[in-house]
């Protein structure tokens, strides 16, 4: 676990410097990373609530 944490902090500092150069590539990957993180943390609490809402919206859309 310690190794993983250290590598993560290092990659963060590197990405901050490359943010201006590869803004498109970073936005795509971040995104993706942010989605994964939000699902793991808030997914458990909002699963029931989000399912009710999405089910109604999907039924109307489709």
UniProtKB/Swiss-Prot annotation:
GO terms for biological process: chromosome condensation; sperm DNA condensation. Its main location: nucleus. Residues 1-62 are annotated as: Disordered. Keywords: Chromosome, Developmental protein, Differentiation, DNA condensation, DNA-binding, Nucleosome core, Nucleus, Spermatogenesis. The keyword rRNA processing does not apply. It comes from the Eukaryota. GO terms for molecular function: DNA binding. Belongs to the protamine P1 family. Protamines substitute for histones in the chromatin of sperm during the haploid phase of spermatogenesis. They compact sperm DNA into a highly condensed, stable and inactive complex. This is Sperm protamine P1. It comes from Dorcopsulus vanheurni (Lesser forest wallaby).
């Amino acid at each position: 676990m310690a190794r993983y944490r250290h590598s993560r902090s290092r990659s963060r500092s590197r990405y901050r410097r490359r943010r201006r150069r590869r803004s498109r590539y970073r936005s795509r990957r971040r995104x993706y990373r942010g989605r994964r993180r939000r699902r793991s943390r808030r997914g458990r609490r909002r699963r029931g609530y989000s399912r009710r809402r999405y089910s109604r919206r999907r039924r109307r859309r489709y």
